[in-house]
Amino acid sequence: MPPPLHIRTYHQLTEADRSGLGEQVGAQHRRVAERLAPVHRIVAVMSGKGGVGKSFVTALLARALARAGQRVGALDADLNGPTLARLLDARGPLAVTAGGVEPVAGTDGVRCVSMAHLLEDGKPLAFKGPGSDAFIWRGALEAAALRELLGDVTWGALDVLLVDLPPGVARLHELLDLLPAPPDVLAVTIATVESADAVRRALNAARERGARLLGVIENMAGPQFPGDGGDTLSREFAIPLLARIPFNPGDAIWQTLAERL
């Protein structure tokens, strides 16, 4: 059985627990900083909207970096729709040692941690909250789960940790609140105006929080998705268009992308 996250429901918290939440969160932040100290670089991969192949890009980029000789970790921060472990063939369960939770080694040695390692196949992530306020408590528990995935995992010495963010900007803000320093940010879009609009908002949010924008990747490039979304975002934010990735790309494009990072 996979190890459970050490998260209690609202009803399981005592008054002492509730009054000490600030201290507990501070301790978790310090633990995150300690765990990530051996990690040379953190890159958050974001899209702003779903359906652009962001997790696919994250997985193939992680493998290319590993093949280039880098020590690579990959965290699936999409708690509700985790796919990164499957894309990296990182089969669980996670192993718990005296030092913490060990990542699962996937293809090309990429060290992966995903909520999929903690859930039974096909089971949704479900947090319980107090009655009509459950949606508020659910958000707090998801943030706590992200803290534990960062703070309880023995990532070890890594050249780069890729964090696969879910669509939107909420998880980006949670990540930025947790990390001791802002990460680098890589944006994935398709060429359409609609995708570029969503990614624009996400990039603005990242820039306002002090993250360094590495560039944009236009995925699924070709006649199926007309437009110039990648070029538009590159011009607006003065960041490079790192790659146009077609359907069924070969290995060479991933190696080139890894070199550009």
Name the predicted role of every residue range:
Residues 71-73, 77-125, 231:
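Phosphate-binding loop that captures ATP/GTP phosphates
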Residues 39, 50, 76, 84, ...:
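Residue-level signature of catalytic and energy-coupling elements of molecular machines
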Residues 35-38, 57, 61, 79-80, ...:
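Helical mechanochemical/support elements of P-loop NTPase systems and associated helical scaffolds
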Residues 78, 96, 116-175, 179:
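Switch II (G3) loop of P-loop NTPases
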Residues 1-49:
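Extreme N-terminal, non-catalytic leader segments
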Residues 1-4, 237, 246-261:
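NTP-binding/hydrolysis catalytic cores, primarily Walker-type P-loop NTPases
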Residues 152-251:
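Conserved catalytic-core segment of NTP-binding enzymes
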Residues 41-78, 203:
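Walker A/P-loop phosphate-binding motif and the immediately C-terminal alpha-helix
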